[in-house]
A protein has these predicted regions:
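Conserved interdomain linker/interface between the two RecA-like ATPase lobes of SF2 helicase motors
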Residues: 190-263
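C-terminal helicase lobe and adjacent C-terminal extensions/tails of nucleic-acid helicase motors
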Residues: 179, 237, 241-306, 330, ...
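Conserved two-lobed SF2 helicase motor
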Residues: 101-119, 308-323
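Conserved Walker A/P-loop ATP-binding site and its immediately adjacent core
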Residues: 23-47, 59-65, 174-178, 260
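Post-DEXD/H (motif II) to motif III coupling segment of the RecA-like Helicase ATP-binding lobe
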Residues: 127-136, 143-217
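Walker A/P-loop NTP-binding motif
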Residues: 6-23, 41, 157-159
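Walker A/P-loop
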Residues: 1-13, 145-146, 171
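A substrate-engagement module of RecA-like helicase motors
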Residues: 42-107, 112-116
Length: 612
């Protein structure tokens, strides 16, 4: 964690592209936020890769057209620096901007879905294979996918191995068993020794590679000092007192929990208990512009180059978005109990950079927020299930030596097959977990492309025609949904409808300016509206709720904003209209948007008259 995996991957990609005469790089990341974060870094790197011709670059995910860095590059070649030589340029070419052609550009940054869809039977899948076949493929945070997504990742790796495409997989917390599965997928033409030592290595940082015939490994020595992190158990009631003591002489704290609702609850508790501290929220249920502004502010205040004046007395309460997308440097960390690999990712934000810290915070300390009872937090259980939480709680030590303990701790939690039978409760949780994993794999297998198989006489070759007999997704949006498990998510554009019926941006967005509702907005205004995007909480996407949600949103849009559907940028979008108090009623839920807290919701209370 924090040892330069990205820079090492790009250096390796440059060497392999030169050695094998490849024409570009695909960089896949788990979320749109992480893809946006790496895009700027890859721009500068890609700009140095050719001294003769401009290179095409693409940002490939569902909201790429709303990314300001990406938009500024559209319309031809753009110099990244004012004094850059004329020949050192990158470009976003119009031809590559369609979803079908995006992977054909020389350099592509996107969500991992773009790679997973190469393993999905859908129309034009051959263009994805064509785009990937001439590149070096880099996948970051490859531990971050569930059993469902892993089925598509493994099948994609089988085809990339068949094409002899170099693949670089990055993770700081990858279990050894999963590492072996990834290598076996890529090497599927070759039988690998099931007892080979590389399968069980626990070094860190560990480099594992294959030359097509055998698997090799080396532990890379670090020239940076390690550290010991003290772990302490904590309940929610004890949290304010702990932070009061730890921040008595200044410094900043991070509190990472597993659900947005829990983050909002904790933030309110801390604001009431610690009025002399500044409490900031950071989670996924902010409008895109609000989240971007918060991210930029947090990077300035507690990022790598922050100063004590900006850090002191700041508490950031967030969710999993703090695990992956932000290079934060926290003086003290509180994390809710989560699977061990993710807990270690969170600890990677603690004392991340060398700096002078207040005396009470010079020893790295992480408090693990738990219920204090045998049962798990309901929200955590809904996100991660009970088995991995149970295993993590069982093996959680009193202190962690970084980086020495990273791999052994991950192995302890995930390598349960080598252990003696668990307690009756443990066996029950394990059985439930394994059954759920098998169900995920079964669902994923329905629309997987076949494996690459051919006999010695090339008589039994799988062809693209064979793949199309059972097309799994007919649109790009449907394909993205098909490679991720779970209920569909509902995304909305958030605007305000004031007394009298006028439509406005929220008061702090675009100055709260009004937008005509009876005609399509001009392109510049439509782009600003399209950026007011928000993903509704998961409850609104549940099978028993989603149809009602979409029906009500669509009815309001037809009534008030029908003309907006004539705008290319807004066509097909759902708009959530808030009232003067920034609240709305949707599918028996009351929603409220707040600039500091993001979107909150609760079930509507019906009076007695409604029950008759």
């Amino acid at each position: 964690m924090g040892v330069g995996k990205t820079e090492a991957a790009l250096a390796a990609a440059e060497i392999m592209a030169s050695r094998f005469s490849l024409g570009g790089v695909f960089f896949g990341l788990p979320t749109q936020a992480t893809a946006n974060g790496i895009f700027r870094r890859l721009l500068h790197w890609a700009d140095t890769q050719s001294e003769e011709v401009p290179q095409a670059i693409q940002l490939a995910h569902g909201m790429a057209e709303l990314n300001e860095n990406y938009l500024r590059l559209q319309g031809g070649r753009v110099q990244l620096e004012e004094d850059a030589p004329e020949e050192h340029q990158v470009q976003v070419h119009q031809w590559f901007r369609g979803s079908k052609q995006a992977l054909l550009a020389s350099f592509v940054v996107g969500t991992v879905d773009q790679l997973l869809m190469a393993a999905l039977t859908q129309k034009h899948v051959m263009l994805r294979h064509l785009g990937l076949a001439g590149k070096v493929v880099i996948i970051d945070e490859c531990h971050a996918y569930d059993a469902y997504m892993n089925c598509y990742l493994d099948r994609a790796l089988e085809w990339l191995g068949w094409y002899k495409v170099p693949v670089i997989l990055l993770s700081a917390t990858l279990p050894a068993r999963r590492r072996a599965e990834l290598i076996e997928a890529y090497q599927q033409k070759h039988r690998l020794d099931p007892d080979a030592p590389w399968r069980f290595s626990c070094g860190y940082p560990l480099l594992t590679w294959t030359d097509g015939a055998e698997v090799k490994q080396t532990v890379i020595p670090l020239d940076t000092p390690g550290q010991t992190v003290q772990l302490t158990p904590l309940t929610e009631a004890e949290l304010p007192g702990l932070l009061r003591r730890k921040l008595a002489e200044g410094g900043c704290a991070g509190v990472i929990v597993n659900t947005v609702k829990k983050a909002q609850k904790i933030a309110q508790l801390l604001r009431e208990s610690l009025p002399d501290k500044e409490v900031q929220l950071f989670h996924a249920q902010f409008l895109m512009p609000d989240r971007a502004a918060r991210e930029e502010q947090l990077m300035e205040r507690i990022g790598k180059d922050s100063v004590p004046e900006s850090r002191n007395d700041l508490i950031v309460v967030g969710t999993q978005v703090m695990e992956q997308s932000l290079d934060l440097d926290l003086d003290v960390l509180v994390t809710e109990l989560c699977p061990m690999d993710l807990l270690l990712q969170r600890i990677g934000r603690l004392h991340r950079h060398c700096r002078s810290r207040p005396k009470p915070l010079q020893q790295a300390c992480c408090a693990v927020l738990d219920t204090g009872e045998e049962a798990f937090d309901a929200g955590s259980e809904a996100v991660y299930g009970q088995w991995l939480l149970w295993r993590t709680r069982k093996y959680l030590p009193r202190s962690i030596r970084l980086p020495e303990d990273i791999a052994p701790l991950v192995q302890q939690v995930y390598d349960w097959e080598q252990e003696a039978p668990e307690t009756e409760q443990g066996e029950k949780l394990r059985s439930e977990y394994e059954q759920m994993q098998e169900k995920k794999k079964d669902r994923a297998g329905k629309y997987l492309v076949p494996q690459p198989e051919v006999d010695e006489d090339f008589q039994e070759l799988n062809t693209l025609d064979d793949w199309m007999q059972n097309v799994g997704a007919t649109s790009d949006a449907a394909a993205r949904a098909a490679v991720r498990d779970g209920d569909p998510s509902v995304e909305v554009l958030v605007m305000q409808r004031r007394t009298g019926g006028s439509i406005h941006f929220l008061p702090w967005q675009e100055g709260g300016s009004a937008v005509a509702a009876d005609s399509p907005p001009p392109p510049e205004t439509a782009l600003k509206i399209a950026r007011q995007k928000l993903r509704l909480p998961a409850v609104f996407g549940k099978a028993w709720k989603v149809d009602e949600v979409i029906r009500e949103l669509d009815a309001d849009d037809r009534r008030w904003l029908a003309a907006w559907q004539l705008s290319p940028l807004l066509h097909g979008e759902l708009v959530l209209l808030l009232d003067e108090d920034l609240t709305a009623h949707l599918a028996d839920m009351e929603l409220c948007y707040d600039r500091e807290n993001g979107l909150e919701y609760r079930k509507e209370e019906k009076d007695e008259g409604d029950r008759i």
